[in-house]
Amino acid sequence: AELFPGILKATRFGYDGKGQAVVDSLEEAKQAFKELGEVECILEAKLPLAYEISVILARNHQEDIVVYPVGVNNHINGILSSTTVYSDLVPKDLVHEAQEHAKKLASGLNYFGVMCVEFFVLDESKLQSAQPRLVANEIAPRPHNSGHYTINATACSQFEQQVRVMAGMPLGDTSLLVPTIMLNILGD
């Protein structure tokens, strides 16, 4: 398998584009390794990315799971810029597949609370026949910035959902009330 182009990522404390570097050669990988502080890293293949989606779910102690509408994420310089959510944005079969993977992951980890699983959706025109079209990119065992849209756009926000799980209350309604675009504004 080709090593380059790839993304060199620190195995700990990397997020929002931090702790990673795109590398096109062994020389660039060595330089990036130095710039990352020579900490433990992994080299990921650069995938034919079409877009990224977030699946946000909540799982309670009775093992019930609710899933929020899937959002499509846009990044600028490796940092989430916006999440767009409306009913026909992502093909329904892809939504179902991603949600099922996320639910199996939460159940397999015996996780309780709100969790986000980000998936890369790969460009099918560039895939080889045996390659999956979804690749899990990030698992966040907490309310996630791509789910901040739930504050105003769903019946029950991801934050209220977390409280419901911890308090032993029934899970809330995740229905989308309005089509939404969430802008991620960061402070220093």
Predicted feature residues:
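Short, well-ordered secondary-structure micro-motifs
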Residues: 53, 81-83, 136-138, 149-150
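Active-site "cap" helix and flanking loop/linker of ATP-utilizing ligase/carboxylase catalytic domains
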Residues: 97-117, 140-188
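Intrinsically disordered, low-complexity coil segments
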Residues: 2-3, 89-92, 122-133
